[in-house]
Amino acid sequence: MNAGDTAFILLCAAFVFIMTPGLAFFYGGMVRRKNVGNTMMQCVFIMGVSVIMWVLVGYALSFGGNHAGIIGGAKWFGFNGVGMKPGPYADTIPNLAFAAFQMMFAMITPALITGSVAGRMKFKALVLFIILWSLIVYYPMAHMVWGEGGFLAEIGSVDFAGGNVVHITSGVSGLILALTLGKRRGYDQGVYHVHNTPFVFLGAALLWFGWYGFNAGSALAANGLAAHAFMTTSVSAAAALVSWMLIEVFSEGKTTLVGASTGLVIGLVAITPGAGFVPMWAAVICGLLVSPICYFGVKLIKGKLKIDDALDALSADGTLGTIAEKYFGTDLT
């Protein structure tokens, strides 16, 4: 084992943890005043239940053994056998450290979905949904992409830090949930305004901070690959931020803090699948392209399909990053 790698991964896990409170501020600032408490409480609840589920069954179903390439096994239920020695996924850090890092991914992913149903889903219903979604969607998906013998990994799927496992699954699930629940009352009659702009910016800043642990930590060691992922993360977020602001200037005549915050977040999402694989110039292109795609694409899709995705969560998935990794990815190790 390597003490430096272990300290690095635990620090990155703490960074990723910060993302869920950051998301609570980001979403809480965007919703109407009457929905702020409920929206933020949803993220707080997920912070608690995701840890308990991960220790009891989540880690085992995601990374413990393999059944038909779809789901893990039962050998690590209750963290039984998950100790201080390295596991099968990283040679230089304890299995516990790897499990802790992955636990934070299992926390932020269901929290992302709450943006699609803000102001429409009762808290009790959300509790049941998050528990079932984690069991039926997230754990199997994590195993298929990242687990030993996972079906998607075996056919060549590459996801450096969760663009597919985290962002596409949460984005698609949020879209389906928004369609199922229907529109908010008065959705067609009124215009919804951001409730608290400073909350939105604070949330975006915390997300950017935490995303360094999200992407750099996925190298699972304090090495050059982690440094590369750190920089591509910075570049993509910055490019998307500037790109979104330019779009606002040309289309609306002014820039907004909410727009800049949204731009940087989708830039972070876009680079996630290939943060450790794409060259720096591709990270710039990824950031520059994702803003116009989301800015105009969401308006078109929501207009055509009449979707009430409360916080436009469907726009922030990892599709562009997955494409960038496919066509621009290189072996940097």
State what each model feature region is.
Residues 1-316:
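Hydrophobic alpha-helical transmembrane bundles of multi-pass membrane proteins
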Residues 38, 331-332:
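Residue-level detector of short coil/turn "hinge" positions at structural boundaries
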Residues 307-331:
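Extended ligand-binding regions for polar small-molecule ligands
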